[in-house]
From Swiss-Prot:
PANTHER family: FMN_FAD EXPORTER YEEO-RELATED, MULTIDRUG RESISTANCE PROTEIN NORM-RELATED. Multidrug efflux pump that functions as a Na(+)/drug antiporter. GO terms for cellular component: plasma membrane. This is Multidrug resistance protein NorM. The lineage of its organism: Bacteria, Pseudomonadati, Pseudomonadota, Gammaproteobacteria, Vibrionales. Its main location: membrane. The chain crosses the membrane at residues 11-31, 53-73, 93-113, 126-146, 159-179, 189-209, 242-262, 276-296, 315-335, 356-376, 391-411, 417-437. Belongs to the multi antimicrobial extrusion (MATE) (TC 2.A.66.1) family. It comes from the Bacteria.
Length: 456
């Protein structure tokens, strides 16, 4: 029991800065929306549409680079810090390489908006935002590379501090470029893209300054030796990171596709769906942070050749995450009307949102299990298991169930948005079950198999 308490303490210390950094990231999006809305509804809508194109694109790059965290954690646990610079420098090369196709996708924004039949004025503002923010792609991915270094070494506070500096800088920079203050041009919603690009470059440079000057990282000697790009290392990193990137893509696109399928059901349904989704996304940051911390702890323990420690870290992560999920689920049910009132005063929307928030409360528990189990499996570098199981859960089980219940009369009368939320529960519960079973299978193997599995 003492080991479990000690592990829980270590986990919470790691997860708290990750959570706060996520809040800062969300805060930047909130500031963009509010300040663009101060210009016009069209500017605010343009920023929202641009975010729906920008975020899935950049998330794919983040997913690829997330593979570096367990790599660094395992090397750190094994006392092989001298090998860390090679991995991070290869990661930086990967970040620059994948910036090219991501920018290429962002360049196609005009075609995407044309396909969506977006209003011409809104489309122009959206394209302007994307063309500005695409300059942030290399900086954002290089920042993630360096964050993989600090997180992998169990130093999660630097990214938290720099994330809040970024948020604080984003406010005056938005004020300058959105409203045309201090000699800057008044760009409206496009100015949010300019501010975001500047902020991400500053955040990258600040983290670079930290990793090169911190006494805590003196032994790593990140840039003392230059390691040229190696094709084998790039292929290995891509193979390790691609399943994580794809799994993130499956999850993001699941919610995006459901939003499109709900759209024809009317503005009231769409508004209620958006209230429930937005609140769920905020709550999800809590188990997501615990999952990230679990990945670090499991990787570190495996580096120390302690399969028992890795098993305890996995169990503690799931227990802590499930406990917090039960608490937030109860609060969601009890306060569902007050939650809906934070978003709107339309009683029809509030009534429907309250129903959807009950579904959201149900899936918070299984969502916590699946994201933390996935974090533990990342610690084992079992990326393909995450890829396979999330694809089956989200796209072969969750989405079809939601579609059948929401829009057809094959089983029951069309349930509308409620049907899709039942689909979410089916998908996330299936993911939790399959990832949990996989993790349990790993834990049942003997030490030699587990350590060889980790080292493959």
């Amino acid at each position: 029991m003492h080991r479990y308490k000690k592990e829980a303490s270590s986990l919470i210390k790691l997860a708290t800065p990750v959570l706060i950094a996520s809040v800062a990231q969300t805060g930047m999006g909130f500031v963009d929306t509010v300040m663009a809305g101060g210009v016009s509804a069209t500017d605010m809508a343009a920023v929202s549409v641009a975010a729906s194109i920008w975020l899935p694109s950049i998330l794919f790059g983040i997913g690829l680079l997330m593979a570096l965290v367990p790599v660094v954690a395992q090397l750190n646990g094994a006392g092989k810090r001298e090998q860390v610079p090679f991995e991070i420098q290869q990661g930086a090369v990967m970040a620059l390489l994948i910036s090219i196709p991501i920018i290429g996708v962002l360049f196609q924004t005009q075609w995407i908006l044309g396909y969506m039949n977006v209003d011409a004025v809104m489309a122009t503002k959206t394209i302007g935002y994307i063309h500005a923010v695409m300059f942030a792609v290399p900086a954002f991915l290089l920042f993630q590379t360096l964050r993989s270094l600090t997180d992998g070494l169990s130093l999660t506070k630097p990214a938290m501090v720099i994330g809040f500096i970024g948020l604080l800088l984003n406010i005056p920079l938005n004020w300058m470029f959105v409203y045309g203050k201090l000699g800057a041009p008044a760009l409206g919603g496009v100015g949010c893209g300019v501010a975001t690009a500047i902020v991400y470059w500053i955040m990258f440079l600040l983290l670079l300054l930290y990793v090169t000057t911190s006494q805590r990282l003196r032994q790593v000697q990140l840039f003392t030796t230059f390691h040229p790009p190696q094709l084998n290392a790039q292929v290995k990193l891509f193979k390790l990171g691609f399943p994580v990137a794809a799994a993130l893509f499956f999850e993001v696109t699941l919610f995006a596709v459901v939003a499109l399928l709900v759209a024809p059901l009317g503005s009231t349904v769409v508004a209620a769906h958006q209230v429930a989704i937005n609140f769920s996304s905020l709550v999800f940051m809590l188990p997501m942070s615990i999952g990230a911390a679990t990945s670090i702890r499991v990787g570190h323990m495996l580096g120390e050749k302690s399969t028992e420690g890795a098993r305890i870290a996995s169990h503690v992560g799931i227990l802590v995450g499930l406990s917090t999920a039960v608490f937030t689920a109860l609060l969601t049910v009890i306060l569902r009307e007050q939650i809906a009132l934070l978003y709107t005063d339309n009683r029809v929307v509030i009534t429907l949102a309250m129903q959807l928030l009950i579904f959201a409360a149900i899936y918070q528990c299984t969502d916590a299990i699946q994201v933390i189990a996935a974090g533990a499996l990342r610690g084992y570098k079992d990326m393909r298991a995450i890829f396979n199981r999330t694809f089956i859960a989200y796209w072969l089980l969750g989405l079809p169930t939601g579609y059948v219940l929401g829009l057809t009369d094959w089983i029951v009368e069309p349930m509308g948005a409620q049907g899709f939320w039942i689909g979410f529960i089916v998908g996330l519960s299936s993911a939790a079950a399959m990832l949990g079973v996989r993790l349990h299978w790993l834990h049942r193997q003997n030490d030699e198999i587990q350590l060889n599995y980790e080292a493959r």
